[in-house]
Amino acid sequence: MSTNETHDRPTRRRLLQSVGIVGLTGLAGCQDIAGSGSDGSYPDGRIEVIVPWSQGGGTDRATRATTPTWAETLGADFVVQNYSGGSTQVGGERLYNADPDGYTVAMWNMPQMQATWLFQDAPYGMDDFDYVGTHHLDPTMWFAPPGSPYEDMAEFIEYARENEVTVGTTAAIGNTALSALLVEDTYDDLEFNLVNLEGGTPTRQATLAGDVDAAVNQPWAFNPDHVGDVIALGTHDSGGQELWPAPAFGELGLDEIPLVEEGFGQWKLIVAPGGLEDEYPDRYEALVDSYAEVFERDAFHARAEEQGGLDEILEYNDPESTATEVESYSEFMEEFEPLFDRF
């Protein structure tokens, strides 16, 4: 499916499976960028922030670290709601079916969002959304339960050659699944039992409990509070990262695995229903400007620092740059469709 294909908006919401909803209302503060809707009253109600994962994972924690300051810069109440399932497609469809009136946004993930329309026949595409800005980029990293008989990724690969192993991923599509598939595909004598654990929280829990032999997540999403509780096998890049002490694949001599030199991770970004910018340009501008202002506030950076070093990977990009990144990730993921067909 073309990443630029626009779909007819359905009249009824389609959900893949049961939806769990957890709400948290942000605090409304000073009205820095408000009253800028076309009717002069926006925002005059609470704004829903969709998180397409369960509560407690990296996307959820990042959202809840952001909304208190965003409430101040916009002058609005935010409510965070979790719609997990379908490797983020449940939440994606919720956003797609929402009215483009400035009262619904989502913190979504790349490349999960692209993979839903590329590989899961989601009813939406890239052009069905308006983009507000990026939030942060988290590297792709492998973990193992405490007490495992391997200390890094090279040792795990050797172990997996001789033993049946189960590898957990945060989704059936996206960066964690891609990393697992690329490692497995690189070596003819390697075969993983891949398990989609549907989110960072279940992946963390399964790793801590020893229910998997290894798992793929992001260092911040896994939660750096657990440094020392699990074994950090390595990051899928050549240079490593500072959030969690771990060797890079390149440092372990695993350069033959694709994308080690380039490195890749997971972006978090704020997305709105398509049509908002056209139908309510002032509201869209208010959301964009107030969101950008969040990254200038000391209180937000202090809160992000308290969240296990989130402040170290914050990376805001404006709407145009964000849309360009979305398109680039779509093209990037499309190259690996044959691999995802095997999951």
For each feature predicted by the language model, list its residue ranges:
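N-terminal secretory signal peptides and thylakoid transit peptides that target proteins
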Residues: 3-22
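C-terminal lobe and pocket-closing loops
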Residues: 221-302, 324-331, 335, 343
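N-terminal (or domain-start) structured segment
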Residues: 31-128, 185-216, 221-224, 298, ...
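Ligand-binding pocket segment of bilobal, Venus flytrap-like solute-binding proteins
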Residues: 157, 168-247, 330
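Solvent-exposed coil/turn segments that connect beta secondary-structure elements
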Residues: 110-112, 137, 147, 219-220, ...
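Surface-exposed aromatic
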Residues: 305-326
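C-terminal motif of bacterial Sec signal peptides marking the signal peptidase cleavage site
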Residues: 26-29
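Hinge/capping helix and adjacent helix->loop/strand transition within the periplasmic-binding protein
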Residues: 70, 94-102, 117-202, 268-302
